[in-house]
Amino acid sequence: MSKISLIVGLGNPGAEYAQTRHNAGFWFVEQLADRYNITLKKDPKFHGFSGRGQIEGHDVRLLIPTTFMNRSGQSVVPFSKFYQISPEAILIAHDELDMDPGVIRLKTGGGHGGHNGLRDIVPHIGANFHRLRIGIGHPGSKDRVSGHVLGKAPQNEQTLMEDAIHHALSNTRLLVDGQIAQAMNQINAYKPK
């Protein structure tokens, strides 16, 4: 039973990307920081914004890389190594093309699934970390993927994603307690309204 002690949100830095689908992982960590009054401060050493605080009685670090998505490993890898956090204690929240908006899934291990942020992390720390996959939907054509992930979702899809993130946040205690199987059951059972 490995307790989550590092929660990472993947996305792209800058105001122009803040509301894009690719930043769903950022949204999760930002809302988590707000919920538990954890201040995220610029951390140039690790190319990101990081914070540390108590979440449901556990000491947890939060990280939002300020590298572009395809360079996420430049932040996550040195951060986890410096603080000696094993992959089993890491949760990475990210957008997921292969799931509809409003669908959210917790998964342990696996490959990068074509996700450029994960693709940059897996070779360095392995694949045995936890992923919170936040559905953003697929545009239907491979040629339209870049514009889709870097585009802002229409309000109805945005609401579905926010509701799914809120549901995952309500299961934070299970994650930091190391009750991953129970967290998976709760989070993965979520049905969009």
Swiss-Prot record:
Keyword list, A-Z: Cytoplasm, Hydrolase, RNA-binding, tRNA-binding
InterPro entries: Pept_tRNA_hydro (IPR001328), Pept_tRNA_hydro_CS (IPR018171), Pept_tRNA_hydro_sf (IPR036416)
Gene Ontology biological process terms in this record: protein quality control for misfolded or incompletely synthesized proteins; rescue of stalled ribosome
EC class (word): hydrolase
Database matches in SUPFAM superfamilies: Peptidyl-tRNA hydrolase-like
Subunit architecture: Monomer.
Protein name per its UniProtKB record: Peptidyl-tRNA hydrolase
